[in-house]
A protein has these predicted regions:
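C-terminal peripheral helix-coil segments that are non-catalytic and often amphipathic
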Residues: 1-6, 94, 98, 135, ...
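Short secondary-structure transition hinges
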Residues: 101-143, 184-187
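Basic, helix-initiating cap at the start of DNA-binding domains
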Residues: 1-46, 53-60, 86
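Amphipathic alpha-helical segments enriched in hydrophobic/aromatic and basic residues
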Residues: 20, 27, 32, 36-37, ...
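Hydrophobic/aromatic residues within well-ordered alpha-helical segments
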Residues: 15, 58, 65, 69, ...
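Hydrophobic alpha-helical connector segments
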Residues: 78-112, 160-166
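Short, flexible, glycine-rich and Lys/Arg-enriched loop motifs at helix boundaries
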Residues: 67-88, 176-189
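Residues in soluble alpha-helical coiled-coils and helical-bundle/repeat scaffolds
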Residues: 28, 42, 56-60, 64, ...
Length: 212
């Protein structure tokens, strides 16, 4: 394989990621309804026909975008939790800090806002976001809480509801910034929220001596 051929192969392999990155910007700026595939192709520096080689519909492109939006955080959660053998006391603060870092990417909250705003007109948006992001996060957290209950660390209760309690305030913090602006007097600092909430939620989750 010549150097030129190798460069072309690398360029071709990078195209899906470049298209997804461009699509994320376009979706955030224009919403799902207003996003045009021609704009995505132009921003990605490819022909519109090239885009269709990888994504047949705008819904397919959004699915890939939704997956990419939180991939780094999801993989970190899944890998960290899979290899983790310690207490949930040590794991929850790490996971929330990583979530805060990923949510700090302005495009991720923008995608969330778009889903909330347009899911009634485009029900598939909510379904895609649920399947690619929400279900994976809550599913893994539920498993972690259930395992901690089996070890006698976490009090009795529905582990799925506990999982929502863990991530809920972080989601609310992101939505607050998106709706009211990060310059609001009450807009939460996500890193500080992650630290304080980890302490608060663990204080409620942990089983104390005496079984309470």
């Amino acid at each position: 394989m010549t150097d030129t051929t190798a460069k072309r192969r690398r360029r071709k392999d990078a195209r899906p990621a470049e298209i997804i990155n461009a699509a994320m910007d376009v979706f955030v700026e224009h919403g799902f309804a207003g996003a045009k595939l021609t704009d995505v192709a132009k921003r990605a520096g490819v022909a519109k026909g090239t885009l269709y080689l990888y994504f047949e519909t705008k819904e397919d492109l959004f699915r890939a975008t939704a997956r990419e939006a939180l991939t780094a955080n999801l993989v970190a959660v899944e890998q960290s939790s899979a290899a983790f053998n310690g207490s949930i006391v040590d794991l929850v603060p790490v996971l929330l800090k990583r979530a805060a870092g990923r949510m700090g990417d302005g495009r991720v909250p923008g995608i969330v806002r778009m889903v909330l705003a347009e899911s009634r007109a485009f029900p598939d948006l909510a379904r895609i976001w649920h399947d690619e992001v929400v279900a994976r996060i809550l599913g893994r957290l539920t498993e972690l809480v259930s395992a901690a209950q089996d070890r006698g660390e976490v009090r009795a209760g529905d582990p799925g509801l506990f999982a929502i309690s863990i991530v809920g305030p972080m989601v609310l913090g992101v939505l607050f910034q998106e709706v009211f602006g990060s310059d609001s007097l009450h807009a939460p600092n996500l890193d500080m929220l992650a630290t304080q909430h980890a302490e608060t939620v663990l204080n409620g989750l942990l089983l104390r001596s005496g079984g309470h």
